[in-house]
Structures are given as C-alpha cells and as structure tokens.
Amino acid sequence: PEEVIAGASALVLSSYLVRCKEGEPMKAATLQAIEYAKKHDVPVVLTLGTKYVIADNPQWWRDFLKENVTILAMNEDEALELTGLSDPLTASDMALEWVDLVLCTAGPNGLYMAGYTEEANKRQTQHPLLPGHIAEFNRYEFSRAMRREHCENPLRVYSHIAPYMGGPEKIMNTNGAGDGALSALLHDIAANGYHRHNVPNSSKH
C-alpha cells in the first residue's frame, strides 16, 4: 500500500524484480512501488543481484537507474557489466552519473563508496590519502553524503573501507559482504530519519 512506502526510510529492490517475463505482474508492482517512493521522496535503493542480469542489457539498466534509483549497491563484476570499467572506483564514479550514492564491493579488497556532498561542507580526511585511478580519492571521505539535487555546488566524494583483518590472514569468501555493508547504510538512513523526526532542530542532520 502507498501509505506503507510513504512512511518508509527507503524502498529496497533487487534487479530480479523488474526483469521478468512479459505479462508477469511483478515488474508492474515494482514500478508502482517506485512511483510511490518518488512521490513521497523516499530513497529507492537497488541491488544489482548478479552480473548476468545486467549483461543482458546494460543500457536499459543505466536508463532505469537514472530515472528511478537513488542508491546503487553492486559488486565489481556487476559494475563491469554496467559500466564497462573493471576498476571498482572508476566504475562507482561513472555510476554517479545516474544515482546519488554508490556502494561497490571488491571481494577481498574491501568496499568502495562514491557520492555527493555540498562543496562548502566538505570534510578533509584524517587518514592517509590513497592512490587509485582517481588520485587521492579519499581526501573528503568524512563528508556527509547528500542527494545531488540538494547540493548547490555538488562535489563528488569517495571512500574505501578495507577488510577487517582481525580474523583470518587470507579472506577466502566474501559472500554477504555487500549485504552487510548495505544493511549498515540502511540502518544509518533509518536512524537519521528517526532522529530527524524526534529532534528536528538538531545540528546532526
């Protein structure tokens, strides 16, 4: 129902929901849910699910993202099919042409994030600057992510989260890492919305 989506912190979808056979109701129901989310300014979150779904028609997905999606979650294989770029950082950067925030897992190499912040509010990192296809890409990694449309002077910001090395010396399996990262992000979105509702004048928003 529309009122459920209207009161939600986010609408989370998988790519499978819109790539079904002609005439099946799942796609129409998903698109209706997206329209409700857009109507009530609820962020739409999409997980790409598998590279094979994306490889079938990458341009269709690019158009779908630009029209409907706020936050994109993917792994490096899905990112390659979507953008044609094998580097997860530059693939995430390209995806910012279509969405406001990107999470891209890179197997045992950790997680990349890319998003927008207001130029005037950028926050310098206290960590060492990292090399990459975008030089010193983590310079403003402490900045608060914003929707691009809410920025007067949008600035792209990036970060990298390395794997936690308190466990095994060699990471053998990263299944579920992206789901865990997305869960943390969704928790932050929900907590921020709850705090904004209950303490509307807080400087933390």
Predicted regions and their residues:
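Ribokinase/PfkB-type carbohydrate-kinase core domain
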Residues: 1-168, 190-201
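Glycine/serine-rich anion-binding loops at beta->alpha junctions
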Residues: 171-181
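Short amphipathic alpha-helical face segments that pack within enzyme cores
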Residues: 180-184, 201-204
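Hydrophobic transmembrane alpha-helices
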Residues: 183-191
